[in-house]
UniProtKB/Swiss-Prot annotation:
Principal cellular location given in the protein's record: membrane
Name of the protein in question: ATP synthase subunit delta
Gene: atpH
Location of the protein in the cell: Cell membrane
GO CC list: plasma membrane; proton-transporting ATP synthase complex
Phylogenetic placement of the source organism: Bacteria, Bacillati, Bacillota, Bacilli, Lactobacillales
Source species: Levilactobacillus brevis (strain ATCC 367 / BCRC 12310 / CIP 105137 / JCM 1170 / LMG 11437 / NCIMB 947 / NCTC 947)
Function: F(1)F(0) ATP synthase produces ATP from ADP in the presence of a proton or sodium gradient. F-type ATPases consist of two structural domains, F(1) containing the extramembraneous catalytic core and F(0) containing the membrane proton channel, linked together by a central stalk and a peripheral stalk. During catalysis, ATP synthesis in the catalytic domain of F(1) is coupled via a rotary mechanism of the central stalk subunits to proton translocation.
Length: 180
Protein backbone atom coordinates (compact mmCIF):
# COMPACT_ATOMS: atom_id res chain seq x y z
CA UNK A 1 0.00 0.00 0.00
CA UNK A 2 1.37 3.36 -1.02
CA UNK A 3 0.90 6.30 1.32
CA UNK A 4 -0.22 9.64 -0.04
CA UNK A 5 1.96 12.74 0.29
CA UNK A 6 -0.05 14.23 3.16
CA UNK A 7 0.13 11.05 5.22
CA UNK A 8 3.87 10.72 4.62
CA UNK A 9 4.42 14.36 5.55
CA UNK A 10 2.38 14.07 8.73
CA UNK A 11 4.11 10.91 9.92
CA UNK A 12 7.66 12.06 9.30
CA UNK A 13 7.09 15.58 10.59
CA UNK A 14 5.33 14.41 13.74
CA UNK A 15 8.10 11.93 14.52
CA UNK A 16 10.77 14.58 13.98
CA UNK A 17 8.82 17.19 15.94
CA UNK A 18 8.41 14.83 18.89
CA UNK A 19 12.08 13.85 18.80
CA UNK A 20 13.37 17.41 18.58
CA UNK A 21 11.01 18.49 21.36
CA UNK A 22 12.16 15.64 23.57
CA UNK A 23 15.83 16.43 22.90
CA UNK A 24 15.27 20.17 23.45
CA UNK A 25 16.41 20.94 19.92
CA UNK A 26 13.16 22.18 18.46
CA UNK A 27 14.32 25.73 17.76
CA UNK A 28 17.58 24.75 16.10
CA UNK A 29 15.83 22.00 14.15
CA UNK A 30 13.18 24.45 13.00
CA UNK A 31 15.83 26.88 11.77
CA UNK A 32 17.66 24.11 9.98
CA UNK A 33 14.50 22.88 8.29
CA UNK A 34 13.74 26.39 7.05
CA UNK A 35 17.15 26.48 5.40
CA UNK A 36 16.60 23.01 3.94
CA UNK A 37 13.26 24.18 2.53
CA UNK A 38 15.01 27.15 0.89
CA UNK A 39 17.53 24.81 -0.71
CA UNK A 40 14.76 22.68 -2.21
CA UNK A 41 12.77 25.74 -3.30
CA UNK A 42 15.82 27.35 -4.89
CA UNK A 43 16.62 24.07 -6.67
CA UNK A 44 13.24 22.69 -7.74
CA UNK A 45 14.76 19.74 -9.61
CA UNK A 46 16.75 18.53 -6.61
CA UNK A 47 14.09 16.30 -5.07
CA UNK A 48 13.28 14.80 -8.47
CA UNK A 49 16.93 14.09 -9.18
CA UNK A 50 17.43 12.52 -5.75
CA UNK A 51 14.48 10.22 -6.47
CA UNK A 52 15.36 9.48 -10.10
CA UNK A 53 16.13 5.78 -10.43
CA UNK A 54 17.62 6.38 -13.89
CA UNK A 55 20.52 8.27 -12.27
CA UNK A 56 23.40 6.24 -10.95
CA UNK A 57 23.33 5.74 -7.19
CA UNK A 58 26.73 7.42 -6.93
CA UNK A 59 25.38 10.50 -8.75
CA UNK A 60 22.34 10.73 -6.48
CA UNK A 61 24.48 10.31 -3.39
CA UNK A 62 26.85 13.00 -4.64
CA UNK A 63 23.85 15.35 -4.71
CA UNK A 64 22.80 14.20 -1.25
CA UNK A 65 26.17 14.64 0.46
CA UNK A 66 26.13 18.46 0.73
CA UNK A 67 22.73 18.26 2.43
CA UNK A 68 23.98 15.70 4.92
CA UNK A 69 27.28 17.44 5.50
CA UNK A 70 25.73 20.64 6.81
CA UNK A 71 22.94 18.96 8.80
CA UNK A 72 22.77 18.31 12.52
CA UNK A 73 22.47 14.63 13.52
CA UNK A 74 18.65 14.51 13.73
CA UNK A 75 18.09 16.42 10.51
CA UNK A 76 20.79 14.32 8.85
CA UNK A 77 18.93 11.18 9.95
CA UNK A 78 15.69 12.57 8.54
CA UNK A 79 17.28 13.39 5.19
CA UNK A 80 18.97 10.00 4.99
CA UNK A 81 15.81 8.11 5.93
CA UNK A 82 13.66 10.05 3.46
CA UNK A 83 16.28 9.38 0.78
CA UNK A 84 16.58 5.68 1.67
CA UNK A 85 12.82 5.23 1.44
CA UNK A 86 12.68 7.03 -1.91
CA UNK A 87 10.57 9.89 -0.59
CA UNK A 88 12.74 12.90 -1.42
CA UNK A 89 9.88 14.38 -3.42
CA UNK A 90 8.04 14.61 -0.08
CA UNK A 91 10.77 16.59 1.69
CA UNK A 92 9.18 20.03 1.30
CA UNK A 93 5.80 18.56 2.31
CA UNK A 94 7.42 17.13 5.44
CA UNK A 95 8.99 20.49 6.27
CA UNK A 96 5.70 22.29 5.61
CA UNK A 97 3.87 19.93 7.97
CA UNK A 98 6.60 20.43 10.58
CA UNK A 99 5.97 24.17 10.20
CA UNK A 100 2.28 23.58 10.98
CA UNK A 101 3.18 21.73 14.19
CA UNK A 102 5.71 24.39 15.15
CA UNK A 103 3.21 27.19 14.53
CA UNK A 104 0.54 25.41 16.57
CA UNK A 105 2.95 25.11 19.48
CA UNK A 106 3.86 28.79 19.24
CA UNK A 107 0.28 29.95 18.56
CA UNK A 108 1.29 31.54 15.27
CA UNK A 109 -1.34 32.34 12.67
CA UNK A 110 -0.74 33.33 9.06
CA UNK A 111 -3.23 35.71 7.53
CA UNK A 112 -3.70 37.71 4.38
CA UNK A 113 -5.13 41.19 4.67
CA UNK A 114 -6.72 42.84 1.65
CA UNK A 115 -7.24 46.59 1.54
CA UNK A 116 -8.02 49.21 -1.08
CA UNK A 117 -4.71 50.98 -0.47
CA UNK A 118 -1.27 49.95 0.74
CA UNK A 119 -1.03 49.63 4.52
CA UNK A 120 1.63 51.38 6.55
CA UNK A 121 3.80 49.36 8.92
CA UNK A 122 1.88 50.84 11.84
CA UNK A 123 -1.46 49.82 10.35
CA UNK A 124 -0.18 46.28 9.76
CA UNK A 125 0.99 46.09 13.36
CA UNK A 126 -2.40 47.26 14.60
CA UNK A 127 -4.22 44.68 12.47
CA UNK A 128 -1.84 41.96 13.67
CA UNK A 129 -2.45 42.88 17.30
CA UNK A 130 -6.24 43.07 16.97
CA UNK A 131 -6.44 39.86 14.97
CA UNK A 132 -4.10 38.02 17.36
CA UNK A 133 -6.31 39.01 20.27
CA UNK A 134 -9.45 37.98 18.41
CA UNK A 135 -8.18 34.50 17.50
CA UNK A 136 -6.07 33.92 20.62
CA UNK A 137 -2.76 33.82 18.79
CA UNK A 138 0.56 34.92 20.21
CA UNK A 139 1.79 35.98 16.80
CA UNK A 140 0.13 36.85 13.51
CA UNK A 141 2.17 36.91 10.33
CA UNK A 142 0.42 39.11 7.80
CA UNK A 143 0.82 39.27 4.09
CA UNK A 144 -0.96 42.15 2.45
CA UNK A 145 -2.69 42.58 -0.84
CA UNK A 146 -4.14 45.68 -2.45
CA UNK A 147 -7.49 45.41 -4.22
CA UNK A 148 -9.13 48.72 -5.15
CA UNK A 149 -12.51 46.94 -5.44
CA UNK A 150 -12.54 46.64 -1.65
CA UNK A 151 -13.24 50.41 -1.65
CA UNK A 152 -12.36 50.77 2.05
CA UNK A 153 -11.94 48.72 5.22
CA UNK A 154 -10.13 45.39 5.40
CA UNK A 155 -10.63 41.73 4.63
CA UNK A 156 -8.59 39.29 6.72
CA UNK A 157 -8.28 35.67 5.59
CA UNK A 158 -6.60 33.03 7.71
CA UNK A 159 -6.92 29.28 7.25
CA UNK A 160 -10.68 28.73 7.16
CA UNK A 161 -11.71 32.12 8.56
CA UNK A 162 -12.61 35.27 6.67
CA UNK A 163 -13.31 38.52 8.47
CA UNK A 164 -14.76 40.93 5.95
CA UNK A 165 -14.97 44.50 7.13
CA UNK A 166 -14.75 45.96 3.65
CA UNK A 167 -16.89 48.81 2.46
CA UNK A 168 -17.69 46.78 -0.65
CA UNK A 169 -19.34 44.07 1.45
CA UNK A 170 -21.23 46.61 3.55
CA UNK A 171 -22.56 48.28 0.38
CA UNK A 172 -23.58 44.89 -1.04
CA UNK A 173 -25.42 43.99 2.18
CA UNK A 174 -27.22 47.31 2.18
CA UNK A 175 -28.15 46.78 -1.47
CA UNK A 176 -29.56 43.33 -0.61
CA UNK A 177 -31.62 44.79 2.24
CA UNK A 178 -33.00 47.54 0.03
CA UNK A 179 -33.94 45.06 -2.69
CA UNK A 180 -35.61 42.64 -0.27
Amino acid sequence: MSLNRATVAKRYSQALFDLLSEKDQLESGYTELQELRRIFQDNPQLSTMLSDASLQVADREALLQPLLKQASPYIKNLIQMVYDYGRMENMVDIIDQFQVLYDELHHTVYAEVTTAVELSAEQKSQIEAVYAKRVGAEKVVLSSKVDPDVIGGVIVKAADTILDGSLRTKINRLRQQLLA
